[in-house]
Amino acid sequence: TTADVANGGFVVGAGLQGVRPIYVVRYQGFQWYNSPMIVNYASKSKEIWNRPCPIFIRSIAMEGGMGPVAGSSHHSLYQRMPGTKIISPMTPKEYEFAYKSFMKEDDVYYVSEHGRSYDNTEELGDVFHDEPDVVLFPISITRFDAEEARKELEKQGIKASIIHQLWIKPFLFTEIWKRQLNSSKFGGIVLDDDYEQGVASSIAHRMMLESDKKVYTMGL
């Protein structure tokens, strides 16, 4: 066996040789050990030395007694580094899209997966309301929970729109999303399986700068 800190170096070497390695990390929390070589070399290699180092990182999140560092999603660790794209597919077609996108490009792809999504066979569509009370922007596994929350809120007479977040980085705040947020009564909430002080806060801040509403965050 090898240490987690060594595996990142192996895949970086493979990426530099054009192998396009798929790196499976069993628990996202272990990215604290697996990520240093990737984010400090592979992610920067293309921009600094004009030598791409494409790596497809399958980073798997899980819940339930996994320990203080092993559980939940940790995609925020990769967000601040240039040259890294972050995507969080939760459906079969989304995952197929993620892989095909990676094969067309030469960037580092951090694929934030979640074990709970593996049994899912259905696609997830956005839900729009005219003048909603609130707009939910769920990421990762919170997308399924957002659907359940929407149904419960509707029973209470609260209209909640849902705009599913597939791409984390680059984040594109589309005009349709902006109109939906601006037409809401109370603003939006970014839901994430990671800590609030990371991807969720960054996306919420971006939305507030480009809209007229407040956007809150919840780390679930």
Residue positions per predicted region:
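Conserved thiamine diphosphate
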Residues: 2-6, 12-137, 143-145, 160, ...
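Thiamine diphosphate
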Residues: 4-7, 50, 114-220
